[in-house]
């Protein structure tokens, strides 16, 4: 039974909705970040990170590019591996047993690496050797994927330049390394600004590097809306680097141009959604919910949710990622994720009186 206080709150909310509908300007088309798959589009237990298959999956899921890590073997062959040891991502090739003792990449020749170890996967077909830089870049070229090299090896950047011209990304914290790359390439140079919160100082460093450039950081508090706006207006890229949920949503709202992510997706015009669900001009009282669960499990899927609203809401995607979003005035947010063997769903719960002028959810089958 509704109390007079509840009825009054509902009436005020409906009046606000009616006023909003009478003076709503034409909706602008939002611009979302370029999506880069961190260590490729890996899938836990199935598709290994930093693998050729992770490049193919990045193409399948609609990512623009992949980030990869480059290191030398003992005999100076460049291969793709993030850790100093093989233990987290590899098994013994002979019997697929776990590596109980630390196995350092720097202690192995390339022949030993290829002969004795494979990447971990539940699918025997994906238990492949750790790829060379050339093998991974060849896969990027085959599938039309932009490579982002996280590497301290100048030789790796020369290989990328030979294979891609200027259409690749150099991702490193060293100004001197970026300046070296600039002697032979006008690739996109992404610099780690460190703890310096000054956008002006970042611009000064980037101008010294020259050419196409930007910043990349894992520091969530650095990428404020003014910081992002200042760099973007100066013509530079701003990358949010592996921000966990829900911080990647704030980075998107603040205006980053690139998201380097382990899970995030944005609406993708390259693909026709399998299903689209929409609603307009919905008023919610505190604890009111909007819930949608599809009926079919999808092997390789994506779910995005676009929202124009005023108020505070809690959003859950696939009962996996949870966001608390607040817009004091009518504003836009977009969140999304990739998934494997899952039934897509979302839930929106109002935390205070909220008006959702527009909701669009897209489900993709990749």
Which stretches of residues belong to each language-model region?
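Bacterial N-terminal signal peptides
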Residues: 12-20
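A short beta-strand element within beta-rich, extracytoplasmic domains
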Residues: 299-311, 344-350
